[in-house]
């Protein structure tokens, strides 16, 4: 692990709303989404330095309840907080081998991999750049056809 502070590329939190006659001091988030972006065709991953380990480390850091948002407010995480972790990268043979060690399964289209980690309440998905493009084209096909694009 590098000596400088590591953080995810994108961290999305649900917007908690509480109604009370007392001042809201913040509550635990129900859902946290982490998006990790990697350089296309990167293939220098190791068993200890890869997007899977990186994202799990982010969750472990958040679970310490010592991380703050950009306003300095603590990001409160509880035992029931659900995490959704997405790594956007090319699924190279090396990354595929590492993912299989974590019991990841291939998506039906074989363009990505996924796994649910019960220990940290996290759904983890590795999305290839090709999968994102193919899925977007499928999702928007009717719209593009109607627009004549």
State where each predicted segment sits:
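Charged, terminal alpha-helix-loop-beta segments
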Residues: 1-149
């Amino acid at each position: 692990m590098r000596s400088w502070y590591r953080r995810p590329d994108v961290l999305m939190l649900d917007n908690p709303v509480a109604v009370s006659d007392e001042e809201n001091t913040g509550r635990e988030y129900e859902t946290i989404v982490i998006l990790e972006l990697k350089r296309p065709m990167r293939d220098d991953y190791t068993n200890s330095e890869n997007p899977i380990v990186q994202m799990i480390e982010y969750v472990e850091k958040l679970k310490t309840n010592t991380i703050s948002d950009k306003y300095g407010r603590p990001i409160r995480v509880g035992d029931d907080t659900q995490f959704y972790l997405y790594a956007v990268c090319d699924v190279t043979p090396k990354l595929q081998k590492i993912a299989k060690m974590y019991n990841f399964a291939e998506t039906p289209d074989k363009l990505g991999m996924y796994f649910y980690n019960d220990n940290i309440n996290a759904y983890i998905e590795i999305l290839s750049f090709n999968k994102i493009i193919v899925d977007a084209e499928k999702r928007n096909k009717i719209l593009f056809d109607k627009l004549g694009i």
